[in-house]
Amino acid sequence: MNTYRIHIRSDEFQYTNEIEATNVEEEDGWTVFWNGKDVFMRIRDEHIVSLERLN
């Protein structure tokens, strides 16, 4: 499990948090977060201000 710090912004909200994921992939304008074989979050790349792997 890897820990990531993510900062997301859109017209409606701003969000910063640390999340744990086994894998992160970028595909077709989306950043996809995996926990094993399951996707638990998909975010449009245009909303991601920063994404940093902490470990």
Protein language model features and the residues they cover:
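Hydrophobic beta-strand residues in large extracellular and virion-surface proteins
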Residues: 4-6, 21, 33, 48-51
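Short linear sequence elements within intrinsically disordered, low-complexity coil regions
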Residues: 9, 18-20, 38-39, 45
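Short, flexible N-terminal segments of the mature chain
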Residues: 13-36
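Short, mixed-charge low-complexity intrinsically disordered segments
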Residues: 36-55
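Secondary-structure boundary/capping motif
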Residues: 1-3, 26, 55
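A short beta-strand micro-motif
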Residues: 2-12
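A generic structural signal for short beta-strands and their flanking turns/coil linkers
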Residues: 2-4, 29, 39, 47
